[in-house]
Swiss-Prot record:
Cellular component terms (Gene Ontology): cytoplasm
GO biological process, one term: rRNA processing
Protein's job: Single strand-specific metallo-endoribonuclease involved in late-stage 70S ribosome quality control and in maturation of the 3' terminus of the 16S rRNA.
Cofactor: Zn(2+)
One Gene Ontology MF term: metalloendopeptidase activity
Pfam families in UniProt: YbeY
Location(s), subcellular: Cytoplasm
UniProt keyword annotation of Cell membrane present: no
Family: Belongs to the endoribonuclease YbeY family.
Keywords per UniProt: Cytoplasm, Endonuclease, Hydrolase, Metal-binding, Nuclease, Ribosome biogenesis, rRNA processing, Zinc
Name this polypeptide is given: Endoribonuclease YbeY
Binding site for Zn(2+): H112, H116, H122
Main enzyme class: hydrolase
Length: 148
């Protein structure tokens, strides 16, 4: 049985909002996240432009560039609470470079972010391999190709 999810899906200022909204129907975002969760969760997903993504990455990670996904995890028990911020232009560019659909890449990054929210990380090579395997298993259950 899938876990309970309270989801807030937000779209910031975007150059092509219809493209990104179309790739992220609420019911699919909820499904992707629930498959990655091991407990109930309250998650906010915010889709942002390069400027907002870069500001958040700079302010919170001290890295002055926009990245694909940022995870702000607040609690892991008894309920996972987190904000996942995805930078739409970075996600779109990566999808194009990797030969993926925009929706497929968003699904992967949401799974990736949800795992981070539950304490998974990929700083050490061994941890990265374990996390990538978990992501691949979840993506396969969702009907997607191996993202790696």
């Amino acid at each position: 049985m899938l876990n309970q999810l309270t989801l807030s899906l937000q779209f910031g200022k975007l150059e092509n909002p219809a493209l990104h909204r179309g790739a992220l129907p609420r019911h699919k975002v909820a499904r992707w996240l629930r498959h990655a969760l091991q407990s109930d969760a309250e998650i906010t997903v915010r889709i942002v432009d390069t400027e907002e993504g870069q500001a958040l990455n700079r302010d919170y990670r001290h890295k002055d560039y926009a990245t694909n996904v940022l995870t702000f995890d607040y609690t892991q028990e008894p309920v996972v609470t987190a904000d996942l911020v995805l930078c739409a232009p970075v996600v779109a560019q990566e999808a194009k470079e990797q030969g993926k659909t925009l929706q497929e890449h968003y699904a992967h990054l949401l799974v990736h972010g949800a795992l981070h929210a539950q304490g998974w990380d990929h700083e050490a090579e061994e941890d990265a391999q374990v996390m990538e395997l978990r992501e691949s298993e979840i993506m396969a259950r969702l009907g997607f190709e191996n993202p790696y």
